[in-house]
């Protein structure tokens, strides 16, 4: 079955092409740390031959606590992104939270991301669609895979079909997430075979029901990522940090930066294997 290709500059993203890595840090903590992390990702992905898009947030507008670090903000964040692009020649993905942010962010980065908690907000979807940028839609934890077609349709009505879908787990009772591996193929089907990627970092969140920040299961990142890659996906979304215990956001779910290369070697091996298989239709 023909898969839709979404192009991010010279990077082609599709379910049957070699996987694209969307990776970086959760939130911009400082200019220097962003440069350090981006440089490491670029070095490793170039060595392994993996297409790469740098990810970071300039504002974490949905933190659990009013006291949690949110990021440097729009103006300073765009300056850091511009420097990263000029220094390393990378493509960049970041999220927007308000309609007014869509165009200023799209003027700087290559992919704008619709956060999971906001994925059904029509005003935001319409503003993002109008930019003409490539869009990454995070599947809300409370939305079934089959409902993602409605969100894609909103973007199409707004004149933008350059949509990538991203799964980051589903609510499993209170304060826990699980990943339905059958959901990936459903998301492909309802979106017209749009590229589907897997955010393994945020799928590992596991909250303290009375805490002010998300916990996580970093020790299981490799096994969950291996399971997702075995489905046959367009890309993998992963956040890393040189010192996860002291990261300002989602450290408990972040891959230690020093483990990036061996981690990606495993992901590439699985992706190469799975996409080398002949298509097998077991529906009839």
From Swiss-Prot:
Pathway: Carbohydrate biosynthesis; 3-deoxy-D-manno-octulosonate biosynthesis; 3-deoxy-D-manno-octulosonate from D-ribulose 5-phosphate: step 2/3; Bacterial outer membrane biogenesis; lipopolysaccharide biosynthesis
Location in or out of the cell: Cytoplasm
BP terms from Gene Ontology: keto-3-deoxy-D-manno-octulosonic acid biosynthetic process
One GO CC term on file: protein-containing complex
GO molecular function terms noted in the UniProt entry: 3-deoxy-8-phosphooctulonate synthase activity; identical protein binding
Catalytic activity, reaction form: D-arabinose 5-phosphate + phosphoenolpyruvate + H2O = 3-deoxy-alpha-D-manno-2-octulosonate-8-phosphate + phosphate
Transmembrane segment boundaries: none
Pfam families xref list: DAHP_synth_1
UniProt enzyme class: transferase
Principal location class: cytoplasm
UniProtKB keywords: Cytoplasm, Lipopolysaccharide biosynthesis, Transferase
EC number assigned by the record: 2.5.1.55
Gene3D superfamilies, alphabetized: Aldolase class I
Keyword Amino-acid biosynthesis: no
Superkingdom as given in the UniProt entry: Bacteria
InterPro entries, alphabetized: Aldolase_TIM (IPR013785), DAHP1/KDSA (IPR006218), KDO8P_synthase (IPR006269)
NCBIfam families recorded: KDO8P_synth, PRK05198.1, PRK12457.1
Function (record text): Synthesis of KDO 8-P which is required for lipid A maturation and cellular growth.
Assembly with partners or alone: Homotrimer.
Family membership: Belongs to the KdsA family.
Name by which UniProt lists this protein: 2-dehydro-3-deoxyphosphooctonate aldolase
